[in-house]
Amino acid sequence: MSDFKFTNTETELVVSLFVSKEQVDKEYQKLETEALKKIKVNGYRAGKAPKEALRARLNSKDLLDRVLQNLSKENLNEVYKQLMERKEPVTFAYTIDLKEKENGFTFDYKFAKVPTVSDLDVKSAKTELKLEKVTDKDVLESIETRLNEGRSRVKVEDEAKKGDEVLFDFKGYIDGEAFEGGEAEDYSLVLGSAQFIAGFEEQLLGKKAGWKGEIKATFPSTYYVKNYRDKEATFEINLKEVRRVNSLKLDSKEFKDSPLGSEEYLGQYKVFVKKDLVVSRFIQSQRDFLDELVKELSQSVKFHISDLLLKEKIAQLDKQFNDQLKQYKVKRKEYLEVIKATEEDIQVELKTSAVNEYKLSYIYQELLKEFKKEFTEEEKKQYQEVFDALKFTSPSNDLLDQLAVLEGLLEKTSRTKELKAWNDYKVYLVEELKKLDKEIQSMQEKQTQEPAEEKVETKEEK
């Protein structure tokens, strides 16, 4: 049983092992002896009847299946040992195929190889690192956004703009024919939410309540209804209302008269909001760069993955899909009828999603392998200043990896301009956060001193 045969393909490795008929018979006899002892025949004690009578009550096919199953499990440990010794890049996703031969059985252990990425051309990538410092305008806009969260909307006669909620009736046509699901009354839509197909919401900007007209937009190639993909649709629109958040402006009398509107409180709030924005932009800037880079690279790389691995991921995505349908109390069959799709169409979509998830993940792993930088002591010290300023007592490994990949990539691909901008940004980050922390400390000290001064004044009055 020690003769292994290895067959390699691009995505899988098959380990074949031949087990002779004699070996199978030997194992069969062992199990048969144990099984016969437990069989009862009327007129005899358990296992004491003639062997012919006992065997007549034995399911030999089930017994042989058990023998082969046992041999399969026993041999699997040896297969794993062989794979480790050969340092084969395989995953734990596998199947076992059994083939009966004239003089025995062949066990084929098929393993999914670790997915591979090739033709990774990072130097030609167009994705740029965008670094933005936090301005006073950013701080004020962020404060207003936070203040206006959850505030009610009011009808306006103005032209609709991004962020407004519009109420309208619509009816859609493809090739002059009304299409299913393309009609609604009193439909509510927040402009800029990207709830409709690309190009639809933009054409409602600048329109006032009472406007009637047509909008044309093309369904994307990935649209969930297969029959509508890449087709232009014409929508008849009746715009009934434009609703806008009854926003609270920082320079309004309403805000200035509120407890939050005092100059002292607003000044303190600005400091905390600015620090929050500085920290979030630092983290988001490098994360966005790597995410966009990975997406760009995914369009051109060659990706090799076994269907064995995809099978597990597809099953997982299929379960998520079913859970979502249950959440909305929609039966799968009814959903398929609405989107005019078959079960095969759904499986194709799930497989595409599974491949894409794996692809993005393994492209990032390749970037880690190729570009992850080992920081010098001086660079570690510099980043420690950044983390201290960010109040990160122990930054996550993910963040450290992202920073190491970012710097290594900028250096190895000769992006000197972006590398300088990144290094300057780190200096700005430390200086800005130290300045803000100093302001916060000063405010806190002032707050602790004020009650003490009040107590002194009270004693003097007495």
Curated annotation (Swiss-Prot):
Protein name: Trigger factor
Domain notes: Consists of 3 domains; the N-terminus binds the ribosome, the middle domain has PPIase activity, while the C-terminus has intrinsic chaperone activity on its own.
Region (Disordered) location: 442-462
Keyword annotations from UniProtKB, A to Z: Cell cycle, Cell division, Chaperone, Cytoplasm, Isomerase, Rotamase
InterPro entries with a match to the protein in the record: PPIase_dom_sf (IPR046357), PPIase_FKBP_dom (IPR001179), Trig_fac (IPR005215), Trigger_fac_C (IPR008880), Trigger_fac_C_sf (IPR037041), Trigger_fac_ribosome-bd_bac (IPR008881), Trigger_fac_ribosome-bd_sf (IPR036611), Trigger_fact/SurA_dom_sf (IPR027304)
Location of the protein in the cell: Cytoplasm
Pfam families: FKBP_C, Trigger_C, Trigger_N
Protein's job: Involved in protein export. Acts as a chaperone by maintaining the newly synthesized protein in an open conformation. Functions as a peptidyl-prolyl cis-trans isomerase.
Domain PPIase FKBP-type: from-to ranges: 163-248
Basic and acidic residues compositional bias, start-end: 452-462
Major site of localization recorded for this protein: cytoplasm
Gene3D superfamilies per the UniProt record, alphabetical: 3.10.50.40, Trigger factor ribosome-binding domain (3.30.70.1050), Trigger factor, C-terminal domain (1.10.3120.10)
Keyword Cell division tagged: yes
Cellular compartments per GO CC: cytoplasm
EC annotation from Swiss-Prot or TrEMBL: 5.2.1.8
Record family assignment: Belongs to the FKBP-type PPIase family. Tig subfamily.
